[in-house]
Amino acid sequence: MVKHRNSSRSIISYSSSIARFFSRKAISLYLIFVFAFTIWVLVFSSRNIQTDDDHTKHQQQHHRDLIDSESFPPPYLPPRKNLQKPYENTQLWTPPFSFGLHPCVKPTPKYKEFSESDHYITVKSNGGLNQMRTGIADIVAVAHIMNATLVIPELDKRSFWQDSSVFSDIFDEEQFIKSLRRDVKVIKKLPKEVESLPRARKHFTSWSSVGYYEEMTHLWKEYKVIHVAKSDSRLANNDLPIDVQRLRCRVLYRGLCFSPAIESLGQKLVERLKSRAGRYIALHLRYEKDMLAFTGCTYGLTDAESEELRVMRESTSHWKIKSINSTEQREEGLCPLTPKEVGIFLKGLGYSQSTVIYIAAGEIYGGDDRLSELKSRFPNLVFKETLAGNEELKGFTGHATKTAALDYIISVESDVFVPSHSGNMARAVEGHRRFLGHRRTITPDRKGLVKLFVKMERGQLKEGPKLSNFVNQMHKDRQGAPRRRKGPTQGIKGRARFRTEEAFYENPYPECICSSKEHKEP
């Protein structure tokens, strides 16, 4: 019994010694393990932190390199500012209700198709891109009326834009010829046996009827070739046979497609804008030197700038009006809105500061300084140069007609189109957007807006809810909703009335836009 108790005590003592030994060793090992693990974590983390920091620095440097470089790898868009989206009326973006209207350009059963002819029309198109486009559409219809073969038009190379482009540089020549094969025979150049023959050189009367051109067919008795010196506004806006009007639409919207190079880049830029912004406004900011000089609008300019524009107007021979009262022009709504005025206008309509605005324009007179008041209200301004790289724009540099074509494509495809002045581009884009389904096009009431701007200058009104209410009431019926084309201003008689009519290409309804009761064309 005593032995057993002593034995048990020995075992317990031995076990306690072992436990104390292993306990001390375990603690030491544990401390060593913790210390080693801590060192490993610190080293690994510092490596990761350094790597991430290097990556961030690399990204920042890459971004700076992009901004500083001459050629942005497309698509390059500056970081969008003010991405937070405050409440914004969705009706600002949606197209007006179109009542089921749709394009209709097919000839009626009474239409007489092209028949072979040994008479030819050559034409020199005049003006900028859209003046030439609508003019060519008119001349195709004239050739059809006069039963003549049309030679591919020569483009204007001598006007303000000084663009050396030929027809095939701007338009898809083969598509033009092919699409009109039932309407007019189109050839690339005169046959050799005809080239040396004398030609009748004509300045066809503007806004003429079908009867006028039927009378002009007497020229075929003496000549095989008629050369038309100008192409724009050769046909009346109204009171023409429906088949003539639809032919004009077929030419403009189906025949005069842009060249593959222009169309491809234009659509790419539209895709880049939409993928970056989701939706955007195309602003035709007609605040270029030639427009201000032509209209005599000098509001907000320095004395030196005003004098520069006056000299330009005086020295441009085909601008007939030389002495212009700038204040009267502005009060009558005949001046393009300034960039600042456009900013006030768009803000008054309810567009948020985060709105992306594509500037469809040439060089803005006064540069970035003149754009600052617009940019302070809408920081997300986008230009061709920020959408495309230098390499993509290489073939467009020095060719104003080509760059105008890009602006046209981006404007037609925009969610909202806003022109600051009612020129050829604005009218053509509005008409095309109506044709495609009455896309939202907001036409500023410049005369009404100037009255509000004057009140603001006098301190009688400021930006805010009150101004916004005025602006919206003023423009509730100026957003591209379907309506028939407007006729001449009442009280104006003679040929002067034609200038007061709404242009056919600005609103081709009802001839080229039909109701849902009629069969939809493919």
From Swiss-Prot:
Pfam families: O-FucT. Glycans are attached at N147, N325. Its EC number is 2.4.1.-. It is found in: Membrane. Keywords: Carbohydrate metabolism, Fucose metabolism, Glycoprotein, Glycosyltransferase, Membrane, Signal-anchor, Transferase, Transmembrane, Transmembrane helix. Its main location: membrane. InterPro entries: FucosylTrfase_pln, GDP-Fuc_O-FucTrfase. Substrate binds at H284, L285, R286. Residues 54-73, 475-496 are annotated as: Disordered. One of its GO terms (cellular component) is cytoplasm. Pathway: Glycan metabolism. It is a single-pass type II membrane protein. The keyword ATP-binding does not apply. One of its GO terms (molecular function) is glycosyltransferase activity. The chain crosses the membrane at residues 26-46. Residues 54-67 have a biased composition (Basic and acidic residues). GO terms for biological process: fucose metabolic process. Belongs to the glycosyltransferase GT106 family. This is O-fucosyltransferase 38. It comes from Arabidopsis thaliana (Mouse-ear cress). The gene is OFUT38.
